[in-house]
Amino acid sequence: MMPRNKEELAAMIAHRDGISFEEAYATVNEVAADLEYAFMRGSLIMAEDILREELGIEPDYLDIFI
């Protein structure tokens, strides 16, 4: 099932990567800040790259951050 919010995404990443929820949630929030910068620049490609490189997830998850 696809996560619907940042908390569910963090839980998925914590489980996948074997890290604590807190660590995963902090990473998700850092990525959210990076994505905000990409959105302000109008760069969807940059946003997609951030998701792939920082979280190892596909652009399908971008909706969680909008």
List where the protein language model places each region.
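N-terminal acidic leader/helix
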Residues: 1-26
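Leucine-/aliphatic-rich long alpha-helical segments
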Residues: 10-16, 31, 35, 48-51
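Short linear loop/turn motifs
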Residues: 23-35, 65-66
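Long, compositionally biased
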Residues: 35-66
